[in-house]
Amino acid sequence: MSEFDTLADLVEVTEKLIPFNRILGVRDCRIDDDGVARIRVYHCEDLVGNFARGFLHGGVVAATLDVAGGIAAMMAVVGRTPPKTREEAGRVFSNISTIDMRIDYLRPGVGEWFDASASVLRSGSRVVVTRMEFHNDEGTLVAVGTGTYIVG
């Protein structure tokens, strides 16, 4: 059994081991000192929804917010009961799933890159609720969301 390093292992899982996150191009996974989960995705042709204007697809926005919310939920669980090994962390993380999500799209996804952030609104023994934001490379708020995750 190998020792669990919270942030390093979370980055590896988020950026490398989850196939869909690789398709999205999730990068720069980090947790701020105040506990906010942050990730970045870069604009590319494969993620465009409006080909005439080059806007990011709304599903990409939603999926990226879901990834950020899921990271925040994982960190809430880890904060309560830190796993000691990677195997234990894998069991904990494999039980976390999105059960509800609401996204409000405020403007088109225009930019070279986009940052998604998520913070925990409530962390219970079975459910974690997060608040997410999606900003473009100019810091303009593109979308907001609320995600609910089953964690136990």
Predicted feature residues:
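Terminal targeting signals and extreme-terminal segments of soluble enzymes
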Residues: 1-152
